[in-house]
């Protein structure tokens, strides 16, 4: 098999080249298993899972085995058998690119691996500041930007998980109310693998050498990519679907959008993209792409067309 060997830190594969790397890994997901894993606006097929995610699962398992071997060597050197360290995978990318779907599919595939590893999934949405604080600090228009997250709290969470603590809690975010759910938590209890999904999980500081970042705790990082034109198109399409469903819920923070005409809804979604999501993409998210260990570049119909793997 041939792949790109240009002077770049990445190896590049098209779909066919990448699919060959699946080897004999069986697909244990069925169409019925796949449906609950899909995002609101995605129609991802089992073929996509076989072509893209099975080879990726195989690769990640090799990395995890190597990581466990390294831990064994360290324990032998130190003369003590410390608690097993969870392997942390981060998934970054823009709003509407399909990060959550990728995360759920990976969680399912890695959980069904013959080694029966325990795989937990947490999104960084739970570490957004509460809505009242964002309003108070005049940050509502910056929601999703790095400044809108309680990063120290997220760092403490990751440090506790990485150190092998039991029953580490993470806040839960509601997309319906657009806010943190009071007194509700996800519990992470010594997983073999933790998948962390969020917009800004690849970020580092600007020459701040004494600061700890989310990326410091990550063993393998994935960036889900697509051209901005497609991202905006997918965002508007998703907005229109929400207008006909979730926005009609009386508890929805966005219920005022339910009465918009289709033309008004498209204009509103386009404005939100240009002023918030697109801005965040170009200022904060896209600049972190090249730090990833793996880049999945999507084309039309949410299909991955190009895979870039760090050498």
UniProtKB/Swiss-Prot annotation:
<keyword id="KW-0808">Transferase</keyword>
<keyword id="KW-0963">Cytoplasm</keyword>
<comment type="similarity">
    <text>Belongs to the prokaryotic pantothenate kinase family.</text>
</comment>
<comment type="pathway">
    <text>Cofactor biosynthesis; coenzyme A biosynthesis; CoA from (R)-pantothenate: step 1/5.</text>
</comment>
<keyword id="KW-0067">ATP-binding</keyword>
<dbReference type="GO" id="GO:0015937">
    <property type="term" value="P:coenzyme A biosynthetic process"/>
</dbReference>
<dbReference type="InterPro" id="IPR006083">
    <property type="entry name" value="PRK/URK"/>
</dbReference>
<keyword id="KW-0173">Coenzyme A biosynthesis</keyword>
<dbReference type="InterPro" id="IPR004566">
    <property type="entry name" value="PanK"/>
</dbReference>
<dbReference type="InterPro" id="IPR027417">
    <property type="entry name" value="P-loop_NTPase"/>
</dbReference>
<protein>
    <recommendedName>
        <fullName>Pantothenate kinase</fullName>
        <ecNumber>2.7.1.33</ecNumber>
    </recommendedName>
</protein>
<keyword id="KW-0418">Kinase</keyword>
<dbReference type="GO" id="GO:0005524">
    <property type="term" value="F:ATP binding"/>
</dbReference>
<dbReference type="GO" id="GO:0005737">
    <property type="term" value="C:cytoplasm"/>
</dbReference>
<dbReference type="GO" id="GO:0004594">
    <property type="term" value="F:pantothenate kinase activity"/>
</dbReference>
<dbReference type="Pfam" id="PF00485">
    <property type="entry name" value="PRK"/>
</dbReference>
<feature type="binding site">
    <location>
        <begin position="93"/>
        <end position="100"/>
    </location>
    <ligand>
        <name>ATP</name>
    </ligand>
</feature>
<keyword id="KW-0547">Nucleotide-binding</keyword>
